[in-house]
Each structure stands twice: as C-alpha cells, then as structure tokens.
C-alpha cells in the first residue's frame, strides 16, 4: 500500500547521518561543505556558528546555541503568522508562487482539472498515487456508501434556528459526528488505533462521504425544505446537486454542465499546502484527537473571512462597482487607499494563480448553460484594466482563485453564506491527506509554538480592599449596536 511505502521511505531517510544534518557544527567544515552551511555571528560575544542547510532550511533549534550564559535558553525565531517558518516536511502539494505553479503529488493542477474527477484526485492526495480502474471503483464505492446520516444526526440539524448560518451548522454537525463513532476516538479506544490503516480509512470514507450530505441538509434547512437523502449510484458532485435541488420530480437529474463545473472547482480547492485551515488540522491532530474533531476545527478556521470568505468579498466588490464605466474611478480609489481590490494578490503567489485561469474558463461554460451573469463583464474588464496598470503589476497583484469562483456559485443559485461550505467539502480531502501524512511522519510532535513574553514581570497579590481601580480593556466601550445585540441575547 502507498501508506506503507511512504513509511519505509521516511524511515530510510532518517539515517544517523541525516538526523545530524541540521545540527550545529562543532568541528571545522571543508570548503565544499561550507557551500551547504550558513555562518551566524553573535555580535554580543563575537562567537560564530556554522549551521547546516538542508532543503533550503535551517533547524530552528540551532539558535538555542546562541547563548550569553550557559543555560540561558538561547535565541528563538520570531515569526508572526508563520511567514517564513516550515513546520513539516510534506509530499502532498507543491507550489511555486513566483512561477504560478501548483501540483498535487507532482501532477500539474491544469492536467488534473482537465482530465480527472474529484474522487480520483481525492485518492491521489490521500494515497499518494493515481488509482487504476479497480482501485478507483472500490474507493468511490466505499465513499458513496457512507453518504447517509444517522437519524439522530439529522434530528440534531433540525434543531438549529431557521436562519442558522450553513457553515455553523456544518461545523457543529461534523463535531457531533465523532460521537457516533467512539471506536474512532483515541481518547476512548486507545491512542494507537490509527496505526491500523483499516480504521484510518474508515474515517476517511465517512467524512468525505457525509460532508456533501451535511452541506445539502444545511442548505435545505436554510430555505425551509425537507432534507433529501443521497442517491449513491450518482457521481459525487451529481449526488450533491441532487440533494440540494430535488423537489418532487420522480426522475430529477442535475445539469451535467454544473456537475462538471463543480467537479473542477472541487479539484482546484482540494488542497493548497499549509494554509490556515490545514495548519489548524495538523495542529489539532498533533494532540492525538480524532479526525472529526480536527476537521471541525479546521472548518472553523476556514469560516474566517480572511480565509474562506474571500470570494464573497469579491462578489460584494463587483456589486459595488456595478458597471464597467465605474471601473476607472474604482481603480483610482484603490490606488489612493480609499477602496480595497479584492480577489487580487496572494500570500504565496506572486504571479497569476493557476487556479484562477482555469476557473475563468469554467465561469464562461457555466454562463453559456445558465445565461450570462451580468457581473462577469465587470470582472473581466476589471481584470484587464488592473493587469495593464503598472501600479498593480509592479506589486505583483494578479487574480487569485477567489476572483471568479464566487461568480460561478452565484450563477448556480448559491447565496454567499454557502460559499465557505462549498469550500469545506473539497478542502476536507486535503485536510485528511495531511492528517494521514502527520500520522505516518516519524518526526511528528505535538505542536507547541513559543511566545515572546512582554507582560508584567513580578507582582505581589494585593487584597481587594487595597487596590486602586484597575485599567480595563475595551469591555466598557462597546458600540451601541453591539450593546443592543448583547441586550437582546441576554433578555431571552
């Protein structure tokens, strides 16, 4: 199996020689070896240290050696937001942001979007290689036979308010899902249960299979319609669209153009290296918890507007612009910092996001089937003018994956509060791929970042009667809107 092969590869790499590769060098280094080191001089005491370079990284623990006095703990690396810190070695997704390259397990995203389907890409990400036909058939069958929800779980979803946010419903339901499978909880069944590939795979089938059902139920709940049950002989995205839209038609068939469009969108969103939610997945999993808890936590990270809400912000921006005639003024406002240009630029990509090129094409295919979305003309003209403007080009601001995806979802009839849900379904496959890799990595440790403490150094306890008024934060300066909202909550 691919999992066992990767374990053997990792084990072979962890020879004594390689374990010492990133350690501090205490003996002279030859001229040739010097090319693979970096010399750090501590100007506080004049001492110099040679650190080995491996895979373009330096072991952060080396800096503990930079001490003024023995045992003082040395130096730490300060990196807010992990902007230049690698915490894992991964074999899943490769990104070259300067060249605009994205590959899953070595396969260009363009080829996978053109020729593959979502469940095949899911197999690739989680297992490491593309399956043959019998492997893909078995994989797809196991996932599609785990699409149904327990009646008690359905009952739980029905207790949410009629206007509950679909993402909140999804997160809560996924977290609750773990309570239905205590045999998959290391806290109950033993910390080593996921050494069993069968136990591990069972949870993958369940999560990948049930997420579209949970998402569809959240959508139906929001619009006040009865939940639909899955139809397992349909494809993954076809079944999802069926559960979303079927009313009373005896032979309802989702639009095949929309099925394929959603398939491509799911492929493009399946993984993107160590983004915020994937890092959360690995962080939570490092404590040894079950994957349902970890996926719910990762989904919570994705719920944040800076991560999973970007395409909604693009849509709001395009609606605000309104027409092509207003674009020059909008661009002028962006340059003068009066407005923000959403859907352009990326923390990693300093070139055109390869996913955006694919989504642009998919958008036009969807509009040909459903009718043109008026905002597409605004989007394409905004893209054209921005890419011809030196202000944006010099800052390497190119369209990203969110620029067109929201337009497609809007054309398909999804409200903006479903956008993060549509992001979560495919990204869960990436989370699970990282979960498997984390379980198999012999270097895995519980995540425990350091901090730089800048608080009070030492204070003696003072009895309450002898204390002056304490300095308070902003608790007493709520906005009037917030105060009203809190008063409504507390009055119920």
UniProtKB/Swiss-Prot annotation:
Domain of life: Eukaryota
Gene Ontology MF term list: citrate (Si)-synthase activity
A Gene Ontology biological process term: asexual reproduction
Keyword Transit peptide: yes
Amino acid composition bias (Polar residues), ranges on this chain: 475-484
Annotated active site: 307, 346, 402
Keywords of this entry: Peroxisome, Transferase, Transit peptide, Tricarboxylic acid cycle
EC number, as in UniProt: 2.3.3.16
Gene Ontology CC: mitochondrial matrix; peroxisome
Annotated spans, Disordered: 469-492
Pfam families (UniProt xref): Citrate_synt
Top EC group: transferase
Subcellular location: Peroxisome
Reaction catalysed by this enzyme: oxaloacetate + acetyl-CoA + H2O = citrate + CoA + H(+)
Pathway where this protein functions: Carbohydrate metabolism; tricarboxylic acid cycle; isocitrate from oxaloacetate: step 1/2
Function statement: Peroxisomal protein involved in the cellular biosynthesis of citrate, and required primarily for cell growth and modulation of multicellular development.
Family under the similarity heading: Belongs to the citrate synthase family.
Family matches, as NCBIfam families: cit_synth_I (TIGR01798), PRK05614.1 (NF004126)
Entry protein name: Citrate synthase, peroxisomal
UniProt gene name: cshA
């Amino acid at each position: 199996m691919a999992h066992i092969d990767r374990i053997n590869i990792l084990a072979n790499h962890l020879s004594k020689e390689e374990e010492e590769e990133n350690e501090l060098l205490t003996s002279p280094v030859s001229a040739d070896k010097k090319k693979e080191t970096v010399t750090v001089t501590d100007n506080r005491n004049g001492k110099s240290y040679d650190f080995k370079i491996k895979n373009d990284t330096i072991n952060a623990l080396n800096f503990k050696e930079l001490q003024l006095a023995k045992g003082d703990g040395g130096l730490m690396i300060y990196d807010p937001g992990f902007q230049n810190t690698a915490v894992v070695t991964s074999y899943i997704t490769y990104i070259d942001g300067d060249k605009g390259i994205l590959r899953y397990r070595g396969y260009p995203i363009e080829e996978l979007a053109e020729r593959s389907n979502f469940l095949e890409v899911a197999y690739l990400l989680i297992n490491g290689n593309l399956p043959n036909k019998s492997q893909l058939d078995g994989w797809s069958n196991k996932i599609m036979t785990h699409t149904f929800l327990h009646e008690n779980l359905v009952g739980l979803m029905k207790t949410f308010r009629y206007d509950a946010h679909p993402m909140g419903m999804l997160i809560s339901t996924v977290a609750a899902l773990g309570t239905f499978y205590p045999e998959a909880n290391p806290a109950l069944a033993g910390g080593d249960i996921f050494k069993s590939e069968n136990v591990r795979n069972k949870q993958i089938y369940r999560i990948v299979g049930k997420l579209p059902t949970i998402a569809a139920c959240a959508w139906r709940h929001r619009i006040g319609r009865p939940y639909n049950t899955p139809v397992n002989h349909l494809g993954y995205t076809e079944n999802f669209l069926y559960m979303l839209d079927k009313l009373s038609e005896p032979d309802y068939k989702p639009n095949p153009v929309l099925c394929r469009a959603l398939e491509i969108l799911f492929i493009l969103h399946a993984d993107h290296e160590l983004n915020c939610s994937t890092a959360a997945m690995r962080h939570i999993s490092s404590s040894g918890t079950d994957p349902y808890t970890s996926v719910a936590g990762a989904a919570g990270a994705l719920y944040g507007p800076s991560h999973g809400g970007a395409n909604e912000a693009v849509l709001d921006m395009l609606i605000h612009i309104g027409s092509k005639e207003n674009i020059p003024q909008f661009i002028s406002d962006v340059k003068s910092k009066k407005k923000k240009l959403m859907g352009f630029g990326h923390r990693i990509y300093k070139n055109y996001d390869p996913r955006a090129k694919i989504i642009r094409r998919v958008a036009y295919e969807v509009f040909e089937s459903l009718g043109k979305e008026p905002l597409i003309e605004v989007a394409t003209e905004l893209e054209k003018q921005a890419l011809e403007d030196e202000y944006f080009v010099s800052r390497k601001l190119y369209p990203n994956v969110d620029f067109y995806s929201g337009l497609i979802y809007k054309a398909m009839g999804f409200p903006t509060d479903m956008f993060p849900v549509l992001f979560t379904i495919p990204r869960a496959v990436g989370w699970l791929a990282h979960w498997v890799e984390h379980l198999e990595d012999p270097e895995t440790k519980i995540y425990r970042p350091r901090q730089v403490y800048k608080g009070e150094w030492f204070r003696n306890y003072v009895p309450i009667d002898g204390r002056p008024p304490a300095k308070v934060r902003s608790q007493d300066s709520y906005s009037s809107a917030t105060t009203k909202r809190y008063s409504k909550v507390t009055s119920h």
